[in-house]
C-alpha cells in the first residue's frame, strides 16, 4: 500500500463538473492499493496518516496530527503510484490490482479509515478526477506499508 500525503490549506475533487469533495485545512492523501495488501495494511496506513505529526504547534514545530487539530482529509484513489518506472520511458503497472479488486480494496481502506476518523471525504474510484489544492509549506510525505 502506498500513499502520498500533503498538508493543505484547502483542496477539492471535481468529477463531471460536480464537486465531490471539498475541505479547508487538512490533508489530501493520494492512495494506492496493491495486490498483496490486506486489512492489516489498511489499518496501519490509516493509523499512520491520522497520527502523523505534520501540523505546526504554537512553537512552529511539526508536532500535531490530523486528529490533534481535528482537520479534514480527502482520500483520493490513485493507482499510478504503483507504477514501475525503473525501465524505459513508459510506466508499468504490473504490481497494481485489477480495477475491480482495487476498487473493493480501496473501499475497505476507506471504511477502516472512517471507523478511525470521522472527517473523511473521498474522490471516486476510476473516475476522471480534477484535484485542486493549495499546498501548505509545501509539506508532503510518502508512505509504503
UniProtKB/Swiss-Prot annotation:
Keywords: Cytoplasm, Hydrolase, RNA-binding, tRNA-binding. It is found in: Cytoplasm. Transmembrane segments: none annotated. GO terms for molecular function: D-tyrosyl-tRNA(Tyr) deacylase activity; Gly-tRNA(Ala) deacylase activity; Ser(Gly)-tRNA(Ala) hydrolase activity; tRNA binding. GO terms for biological process: D-amino acid catabolic process. InterPro entries: Daa-tRNA_deacyls_DTD, DTD-like_sf. Homodimer. An aminoacyl-tRNA editing enzyme that deacylates mischarged D-aminoacyl-tRNAs. Also deacylates mischarged glycyl-tRNA(Ala), protecting cells against glycine mischarging by AlaRS. Acts via tRNA-based rather than protein-based catalysis; rejects L-amino acids rather than detecting D-amino acids in the active site. By recycling D-aminoacyl-tRNA to D-amino acids and free tRNA molecules, this enzyme counteracts the toxicity associated with the formation of D-aminoacyl-tRNA entities in vivo and helps enforce protein L-homochirality. This is D-aminoacyl-tRNA deacylase. It comes from Francisella tularensis subsp. novicida (strain U112).
Amino acid at each position: 500500500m502506498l500513499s502520498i500525503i500533503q498538508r493543505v490549506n484547502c483542496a477539492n475533487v471535481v468529477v463531471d463538473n460536480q464537486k465531490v469533495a471539498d475541505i479547508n485545512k487538512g490533508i489530501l492523501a493520494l492512495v494506492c492499493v496493491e495486490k498483496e495488501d490486506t486489512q492489516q495494511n489498511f489499518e496501519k496506513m490509516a493509523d499512520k496518516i491520522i497520527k502523523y505529526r505534520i501540523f505546526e504547534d504554537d512553537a512552529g514545530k511539526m508536532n500535531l496530527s490530523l486528529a490533534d487539530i481535528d482537520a479534514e482529509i480527502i482520500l483520493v484513489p490513485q493507482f499510478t503510484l504503483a507504477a514501475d518506472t525503473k525501465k524505459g520511458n513508459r510506466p508499468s503497472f504490473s504490481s497494481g490490482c485489477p480495477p475491480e479488486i482495487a476498487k473493493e480494496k480501496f473501499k475497505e481502506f476507506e471504511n477502516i479509515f472512517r471507523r478511525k476518523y470521522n472527517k473523511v471525504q473521498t474522490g471516486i474510484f476510476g473516475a476522471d478526477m480534477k484535484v485542486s489544492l493549495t499546498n501548505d509549506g509545501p509539506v508532503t510525505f510518502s508512505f509504503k506499508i
